[in-house]
């Protein structure tokens, strides 16, 4: 999973010390993505194969009623399903309930972690005197998560998984993340919901192409538009670089 995530960064020329650009990936991979507030669902991915060509239509839905950092993780999670998973069709990920019993869901989480927080980038940003296990300071952890635009808990887990902190040390570093951010002079926006609506790509056009090529029924075509509120939102949805 780490190699796949690193390769995607390299293909798009994103440095390991930089935050990954979700929008850059969406555009380069021709993924139609819709960001909007949802209830009970963190994200969804749909892949529809074209019959006459070795290509697919790729769709993603992300819940903006969750924290900005969670939105980025969800998007990266769905990227695994769309770009890496074999024989993939559809995935629904409920709020706070990624299916840990499913091997591909675990793979998606691991892929998302390395895409957001690459080992090489983390190690390059940590001061030399904090490279030993359990020596990293809270201020450095806060700097890392702000830099990579990820959640506090995700960063702690990643630091643990790459051997920089123990479980005991990780537990000691947990707390009210917004208070910790303020203490170190950071904005709390990373951890807050954006509740924005944004459409990346021409979803309406792609859905119509699927219908015209008999890849989906008329009922499914209108269901896609209705479920994602295309009629109501496409007139107003402007690209706001919601999740970077």
Residue ranges: model-predicted function:
Residues 1-244:
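Active-site hotspot residues in diverse enzymes, especially metal/ion-binding acidic/histidine motifs
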């Amino acid at each position: 999973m780490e190699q796949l995530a690193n390769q995607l960064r390299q293909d798009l020329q994103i440095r390991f010390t930089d935050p990954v650009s979700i929008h850059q990936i969406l555009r380069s991979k021709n993924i139609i993505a819709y960001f909007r507030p949802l209830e009970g669902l963190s994200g969804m991915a749909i892949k529809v194969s074209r019959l006459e060509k070795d290509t697919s239509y790729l769709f993603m839905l992300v819940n903006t009623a969750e924290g900005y950092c969670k939105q980025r993780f969800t998007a990266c999670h769905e990227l695994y399903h769309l770009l890496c998973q074999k024989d993939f069709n559809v995935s629904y990920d409920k709020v706070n309930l990624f299916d840990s019993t499913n091997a591909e869901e675990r793979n998606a989480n691991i892929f998302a972690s390395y895409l957001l927080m690459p080992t090489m980038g983390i190690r390059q940003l940590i001061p030399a005197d904090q490279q030993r296990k359990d020596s990293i300071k809270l201020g450095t952890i806060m700097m890392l998560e702000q830099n990579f635009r990820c959640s506090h808990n995700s960063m702690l887990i990643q630091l643990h998984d790459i051997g920089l902190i123990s479980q005991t040390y990780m537990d000691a570093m947990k707390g009210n993340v917004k208070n910790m951010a303020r203490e170190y002079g950071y904005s709390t926006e990373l951890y807050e919901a954006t509740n924005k609506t944004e459409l990346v790509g021409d979803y309406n056009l792609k859905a119509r192409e699927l219908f015209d090529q008999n890849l989906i029924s008329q009922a499914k075509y209108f269901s896609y538009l209705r479920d994602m509120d295309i009629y109501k939102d496409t007139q107003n949805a402007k690209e706001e670089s919601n999740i970077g």
